[in-house]
């Protein structure tokens, strides 16, 4: 069973606010490469958020992408700059 990809309004809003180079890079990963994955384990640097295995994050360059996983549905929720520690 392949992954069904959806996009939250908050994700699309975040995406529109990015500077041009980051926008291009994230669009390439999210709208092209993610449609070809077989499972979420194929996403780069995937980490669970919390212990319920519903929300995850992964990084693309200097940005964190938040996703919600329900069965075979992956919903992109947010894309935000990585915090500098």
Language model segments and positions:
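Long, charged/polar, surface-exposed segments that mediate recognition or autoinhibition
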Residues: 19
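A short, surface-exposed loop/turn module that caps and links secondary-structure elements
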Residues: 32-57
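Generic low-complexity, intrinsically disordered sequence content enriched
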Residues: 22, 47-50, 84
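Enriched for short, Lys/Arg-rich terminal
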Residues: 2, 9, 13-16, 24, ...
């Amino acid at each position: 069973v392949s992954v069904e990809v959806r996009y939250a309004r908050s994700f699309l809003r975040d995406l529109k606010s990015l500077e041009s180079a980051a926008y291009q890079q994230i669009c390439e990963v999210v709208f092209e490469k993610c449609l070809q994955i077989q499972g979420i384990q194929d996403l780069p640097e995937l980490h669970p958020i919390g212990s319920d295995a519903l929300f995850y994050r992964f990084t693309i360059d200097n940005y964190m992408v938040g996703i919600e996983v329900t069965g075979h549905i992956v919903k992109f929720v947010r894309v935000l700059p990585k915090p500098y520690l």
